[in-house]
Amino acid sequence: MRYLLVAFGLLAGAAHAEGGADPDWPCIQRKQPHLSLGQMWTGPEPDDAARALARTPDIAALADRLEQRRLPIATAEAEIAEYAKSADNQHLTALMLAIFDRVEPHRVALMEGIARYGHKQVDLAARIEDHRHRMATLEAATPPDFDAIDAQEQKLDWDMRIFQDRQQALTYVCETPVILEQRVFALGRA
């Protein structure tokens, strides 16, 4: 039964990884390594003045607050609407640029971490397969060394548990870049 679970887990992981065009990308979602402001914002293209405004303390502080995921999107939209009452288009563009400039580097680092996570899963799957081969060799020996078989089985069980826990966490991990994209897009529409 354990071998069946191992085989299923390895096949599911391999099929899961084949979903995207990038072999290093373990997520179902298509890998979009970098976003552009134009994908998220339909307003005017930021010029040098907007870039300078984006670095001002008031806009930077507001962007720092709005980009935080713990702030409900409805609250963030209300704060943008309140800010828009007294701000011109240049300031709104600067605010969007400041938000984007905070989220995008975080998102890129997160995606690089996901790729490393995927590599660790592949390495762990190879280690599990190695445990299986060692167990088969130990079980085929005459006479079988039951202590060695038990030790190998414990290693296999432990690695399988880690592998399965990571596979379950992968769904959430893969959703995080999408959540960040959706937040930036929603704030750009506000």
Where are these regions (language model features)?
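N-terminal Sec/ER secretory leader and immediately downstream segment
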Residues: 18-88
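Long amphipathic alpha-helices with heptad-repeat character
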Residues: 73, 114-117, 121-131, 163, ...
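Hydrophobic h-region of N-terminal signal peptides that target proteins for export
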Residues: 8-17
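Structured catalytic/translocation cores of nucleotide/phosphate-coupled proteins
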Residues: 17-18, 190
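Sec-dependent signal peptide recognition
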Residues: 1-7
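Short, charge-rich amphipathic alpha-helices with coiled-coil/heptad character
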Residues: 83-112
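Alpha-helical oligomerization segments
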Residues: 147-190
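Extended, amphipathic alpha-helical coiled-coil scaffold segments used for oligomerization/tethering
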Residues: 93-104, 122-160, 164
